[in-house]
């Protein structure tokens, strides 16, 4: 991958080229419609309106019977890899001969004489003395009409990043029209086909200026590709494939993994790479690095330095050998002060010797954790104290905090209201054992101190459930066959107090039956004696592990990263770059495909970080497929529908939501953000679609939504809950869901990872020992009775697992310096339309107001789930942030 470091000046002086040209599309301007008005009425073929700087998209003049030519200067702002300074070679020769960038200007209008596209204006752009610029001067007939597109052919032997192209008529800067490019342009030696860039004026398909209709369709065909051959680095082809590249059976037969995206293992689709299949398994694709993603989906230089599979992998590969002599790969920490030492004393890092060049690599990748010992030249791997531990080092041990985090922690999207009792499994009892839960009426009512019956508590909406029983139970025996790990199915019931806080009543752990053993299940409560109290703490550790694993595999990876990739692919394949919906969604897709490719390369792959350190081991991603098949629905990805579906909210007669838990920080702040996004989407759709008929008649939009359903989420294509994209209301809901998932939902489940899981006893990723009372073996019970704290520590992740996860979460929780936050930057196409610009400014203003509202909520002592002694305030849905690990900020996209 080539990363940008310094902008390079590439420029030249080109001779005038006498050809037809004129200009349509400009920054902060409104187009005349390129031969039509915005309503679709044709303009006179003999008159080209002279637009103002505020409203015009094109530069134009009144044409009389005598044809005249205008001089148009094209200024290209470019940025190319810094390696060009070292080895320019053939490109220097090309520059000397004037062949650098070939520009072609495409008229929005057809030639009235022939009814065909006007002849294009061509000219070479050459280096100038100004850094990073090319310039061309072209002679353009006044009758050329508005420019609807610029074609660019890169004559260099290397790709080039072009930021924008500015067209100036007659040397008058006030006529400047900017084509926003922000794209890599391949060398013609890689692909002779020039790139096409359209005006910032957005057009529905039916409103496309006739001169660029064919080009609009051709561009989409190019982006779709032909579905054959292996993709190359410079290409921009978007296509679908199954998750068949997680395994590596040619390297190790134990690394064979099932294909996800089949009838047996349903899954969203990923971007096709076309790599050959492995020798051992014809269904598995060979692995390679880097993994192909379309060129413009790749990281910027700044982002690439912040996170990539290479940096992550090299950082961990440097850490592990460096600390291996000091840590035990299979043992846990012997006492809690040893865990605390990770944040105070740290682990010595050798500069040479056992760790090789470990210090330099680690310092480059995760500099936050490398610190110098005072008055020495030695360095240590010392983790930052997570905010939760900084505020209250014992909070993780308390039941109140355990419950509070289900509403305001890392995974606040899984708790449900208990609406049916008794609790019964939906799994086959012939396979897994009796379906009835061990959480009986007697146990729950006892833990409620007889205040009310279970039925009364359910009626008053006081009972809530965290249910990881049916999703994990089928994997219990398989996971237990893996070394040094165990698994149960679990259920936890909570009671809503009069103060609006939750308290856990009971936990159920279940082991399914097997050919040699009956089902085992038991309900645990915090009890009134030491033994029951410690068993309760062990049971909580198992539940926290289940919640942590489900969070990472489903709430985070599946519901954001994996499910969004099909939207990105379909958007690029079916919506033109000049389609208003494309331009609305594009900022929400930044970096996601590259992040997902890197995750397949280093995080979720066979023997990757997730498999090595999380509860389900090699079954982890397969388990996310089970969750996708059983529970994922597009319609309930809408925050209000999700809350209603989980019984956490009801819709009143006035349409507003009423929460079952008044102080539910994720829901409170989330609805604030959701409402802002929906209003922005509604204002945007209202501008471009005047009626439901406009939506239903949009052929690109229809093809886009059809492809999302039938190709991107093909394993769910026949589900009845898919909305139909045929009305403005439905379109607004669809767009709001996509924008919410990529922004608010992802921010809520990602950027608090180090704050809450950086201290791993609070969010263990794996439990390595069965709870002692399962087998009731004398030796285990004797050890438990003598040293219960030691049993807990031996159950938690090993020293090496903990270090690996902590280092990974430090990287994954961080905002890049080039992060783009929602509501912060307007796209050039939005600025080109005054009404859209005004709508965006209102959207941005609402998000700024949300910052203050969230601060007030966090400072209100009545909100006990987000304000109190030692409590981490809920800031994950505050829209803006500084770079680094901050625990706040909503980027536009899934960028990490």
UniProtKB/Swiss-Prot annotation:
Catalytic activities: (9Z,12Z)-octadecadienoate + O2 = (13S)-hydroperoxy-(9Z,11E)-octadecadienoate; (9Z,12Z,15Z)-octadecatrienoate + O2 = (13S)-hydroperoxy-(9Z,11E,15Z)-octadecatrienoate
SMART domains attached to this UniProt entry: LH2 (SM00308)
Alphabetical list of SUPFAM superfamilies matching this protein: Lipase/lipooxygenase domain (PLAT/LH2 domain), Lipoxigenase
Pfam families in alphabetical order: Lipoxygenase, PLAT
Cofactor needs: Fe cation
Pathway assignment: Lipid metabolism; oxylipin biosynthesis
Subcellular location: Plastid, Chloroplast
Primary localization class, coarse: plastid
GO CC entries: chloroplast
Keywords: Chloroplast, Dioxygenase, Fatty acid biosynthesis, Fatty acid metabolism, Iron, Lipid biosynthesis, Lipid metabolism, Metal-binding, Oxidoreductase, Oxylipin biosynthesis, Plastid, Transit peptide
Keyword Transport in record: no
Family (UniProt): Belongs to the lipoxygenase family.
Protein name, UniProt field: Lipoxygenase 2.3, chloroplastic
Species lineage: Eukaryota, Viridiplantae, Streptophyta, Embryophyta, Tracheophyta
């Amino acid at each position: 991958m080539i990363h940008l470091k310094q902008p390079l000046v590439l420029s030249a002086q080109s001779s005038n080229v006498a050809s037809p040209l004129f200009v349509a599309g400009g920054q902060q301007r409104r187009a005349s419609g390129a031969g039509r008005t915005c309503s679709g009425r044709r303009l006179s073929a003999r008159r080209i309106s002279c637009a103002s700087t505020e409203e015009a998209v094109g530069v134009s003049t009144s044409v009389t019977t005598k044809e005249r030519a205008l001089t148009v200067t094209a200024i290209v702002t470019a940025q190319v890899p810094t390696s060009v300074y070292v080895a320019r070679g053939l490109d220097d020769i090309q520059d000397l001969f004037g062949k650098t960038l070939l520009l072609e200007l495409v008229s929005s209008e057809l030639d009235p004489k022939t009814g065909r596209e006007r002849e294009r204006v061509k000219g070479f752009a050459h280096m100038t003395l100004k850094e990073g610029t090319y310039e061309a001067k072209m002679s353009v007939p006044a009758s050329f009409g508005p420019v609807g597109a610029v074609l660019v052919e890169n004559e260099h032997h290397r790709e080039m990043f072009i930021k924008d192209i500015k067209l100036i008529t007659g040397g008058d800067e006030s006529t400047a029209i900017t084509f926003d490019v922000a794209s890599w342009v391949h060398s013609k030696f890689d692909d002779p086909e020039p790139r096409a860039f359209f005006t910032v004026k957005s057009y529905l398909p039916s409103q496309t200026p006739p001169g660029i209709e064919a080009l609009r369709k051709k561009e989409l065909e190019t982006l779709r590709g032909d579905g054959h051959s292996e993709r190359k680095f410079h290409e921009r082809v978007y296509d679908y494939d199954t998750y068949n590249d997680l395994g590596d059976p040619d390297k190790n037969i134990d690394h064979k993994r099932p294909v996800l995206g089949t009838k047996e293992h349903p899954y969203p689709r990923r971007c096709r790479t076309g790599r050959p299949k492995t020798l051992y398994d014809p269904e598995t694709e060979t692995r390679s690095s880097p993994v192909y993603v379309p060129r413009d989906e790749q990281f910027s230089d700044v982002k690439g330095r912040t996170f990539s599979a290479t940096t992550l992998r090299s950082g961990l590969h440097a850490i592990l050998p460096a600390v291996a002599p000091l840590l035990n790969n299979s043992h846990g920490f012997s006492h809690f002060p040893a865990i605390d030492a990770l944040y105070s004393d740290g682990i010595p890092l050798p500069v040479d010797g056992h760790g090789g060049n470990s210090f330099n690599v680690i310092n480059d990748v995760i500099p936050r954790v490398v610190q110098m010992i005072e008055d020495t030249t030695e360095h240590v791997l010392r983790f930052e104290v997570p905010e939760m531990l900084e505020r209250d080092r014992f909070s993780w041990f308390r039941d109140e905090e355990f419950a509070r985090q289900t509403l305001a922690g890392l995974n606040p999207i899984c708790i449900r209201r208990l609406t049916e009792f008794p609790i019964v499994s939906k799994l086959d009892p012939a396979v897994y054992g009796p379906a009835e839960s061990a959480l009986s009426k007697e146990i729950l009512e006892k833990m409620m101190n007889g205040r009310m019956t279970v039925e009364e508590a359910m009626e008053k909406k006081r009972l809530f459930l965290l249910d990881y029983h049916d999703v994990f139970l089928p994997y219990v025996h398989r996971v237990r066959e893996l070394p040094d790990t165990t698994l149960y199915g679990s259920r936890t019931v909570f009671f809503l107090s009069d103060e609006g806080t939750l308290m856990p009543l009971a936990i159920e752990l279940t082991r399914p039956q097997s050919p040699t053993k009956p089902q085992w299940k038991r309900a645990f409560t915090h009890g009134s004696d030491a033994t029951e109290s410690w068993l309760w703490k062990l049971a909580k550790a198992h539940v926290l592990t289940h919640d942590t694993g489900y969070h990472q595999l489903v709430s985070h990876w599946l519901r954001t990263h994996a499910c969004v990739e099909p939207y990105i692919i379909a958007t690029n394949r079916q919506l033109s770059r000049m389609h208003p919906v494309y331009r609305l969604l594009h900022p929400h897709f930044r970096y996601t495909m590259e992040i997902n490719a890197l995750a397949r390369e280093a995080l979720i792959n066979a023997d990757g970080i997730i498999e090595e350190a999380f509860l389900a081991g090699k079954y982890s991603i397969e388990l996310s497929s089970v969750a996708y098949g059983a529970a994922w629905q597009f319609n309930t990805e809408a925050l209000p529908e999700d809350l209603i579906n989980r019984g956490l909210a009801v819709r009143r007669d006035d349409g507003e939501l009423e929460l079952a838990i008044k102080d539910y920080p994720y829901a409170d702040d989330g609805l604030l953000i959701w409402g802002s996004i929906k209003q922005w989407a509604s204002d945007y759709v209202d501008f471009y679609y005047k009626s439901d008929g406009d939506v239903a008649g949009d052929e690109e939009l229809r093809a886009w939504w059809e492809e999302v359903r039938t190709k991107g989420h093909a394993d769910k294509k026949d589900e009845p809950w898919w909305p139909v994209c045929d009305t403005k209301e439905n379109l607004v809901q669809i767009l709001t869901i996509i924008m919410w998932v990529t922004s608010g939902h992802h921010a809520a489940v990602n950027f608090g990872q180090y704050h809450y899981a950086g201290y791993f006893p609070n969010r263990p990723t794996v439990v390595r020992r069965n709870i002692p009372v399962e087998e009731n073996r004398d030796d285990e019970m004797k050890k438990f009775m003598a040293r219960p704290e030691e049993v807990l520590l031996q159950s938690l992740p090993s020293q090496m697992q903990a270090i690996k996860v902590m280092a990974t979460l430090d990287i994954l929780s961080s905002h890049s310096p080039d992060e783009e936050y929602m509501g912060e930057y307007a796209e050039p196409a939005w600025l080109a339309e005054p009404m859209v610009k005004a709508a965006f400014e209102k959207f941005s203003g609402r998000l700024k107001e949300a910052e203050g509202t969230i601060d007030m909520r966090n400072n209100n002592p009545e909100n006990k789930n987000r304000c109190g002694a030692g409590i981490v305030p809920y800031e994950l849905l505050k829209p803006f942030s500084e770079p680094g690990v901050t625990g706040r900020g909503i980027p536009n996209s899934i960028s990490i």
